[in-house]
């Protein structure tokens, strides 16, 4: 059984969404929502950015999909023996926050929404009243966190094309962007090349 091999998973950004489908053992759900339903519902695009100030249709992704269109099995997730951690970036501290939630489905949605909130093109999301953005800003591959937590053998699943190499870019953030969150601005300045917009 998978739980005998992988006692804990960590999901970041879109990986947090995919990880939830894995944790509920809904085989094919992540592929169906990311490929098949994208073609049908076109939930990514400039029309959403112009209409809702969000490049992704979060209402569709985090309400309609899990509740109606592609029902998510919360109970299977809550009952799974493995631990599941979702990573966000805390706008106040500019550091990663690591969340485990296996009781409250609304909080699960708040966390995965925050983990998937890309900077610049998605609004800030809130978890427990704290402003959050995409976990990939500061910990896109949380391998060190897993090692720190005592997991010596780790498997990393990346969504990169073969041969991908990160470019070093010196990108300046305009002064009006996230001006209320100086620590977030610092984090974005350090790691902007890791964000996939």
Residue ranges and their predicted role:
Residues 81-182:
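Active-site gating loop/helix substructures
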Residues 69-83:
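A short alpha-helix-loop-beta-strand transition element characteristic
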Residues 194:
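ATP/nucleoside-binding phosphotransfer catalytic cores, i.e., glycine-rich phosphate-binding loops
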Residues 183-191:
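Mg2+-dependent phosphoryl-transfer enzymes with acidic/Ser/Thr/Gly-rich catalytic loops
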């Amino acid at each position: 059984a998978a739980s005998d091999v992988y006692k804990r998973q960590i999901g970041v950004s879109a990986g947090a969404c995919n990880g939830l489908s894995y944790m509920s053992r809904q085989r094919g759900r992540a592929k169906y929502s990311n490929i098949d339903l994208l073609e049908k519902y076109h939930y990514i695009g400039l029309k959403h950015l112009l209409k809702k100030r969000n490049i992704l249709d979060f209402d569709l992704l985090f309400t309609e999909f899990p509740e109606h269109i592609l029902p998510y099995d919360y109970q299977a997730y809550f009952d799974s023996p493995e631990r599941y951690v979702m990573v966000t970036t805390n706008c106040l501290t500019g550091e990663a926050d690591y969340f485990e939630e296996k009781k409250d489905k609304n909080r699960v949605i708040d966390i995965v929404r925050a983990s998937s909130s890309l900077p610049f093109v998605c609004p800030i999301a809130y978890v427990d009243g704290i402003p959050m953005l995409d976990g990939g800003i500061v910990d896109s591959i949380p391998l060190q966190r897993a090692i720190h937590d005592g997991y010596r053998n780790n498997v990393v699943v990346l969504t990169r094309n073969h041969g991908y190499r990160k470019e070093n870019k010196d990108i300046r953030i305009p002064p009006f962007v996230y001006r209320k969150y100086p620590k977030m601005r610092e984090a974005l300045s350090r790691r902007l090349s890791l964000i996939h917009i």
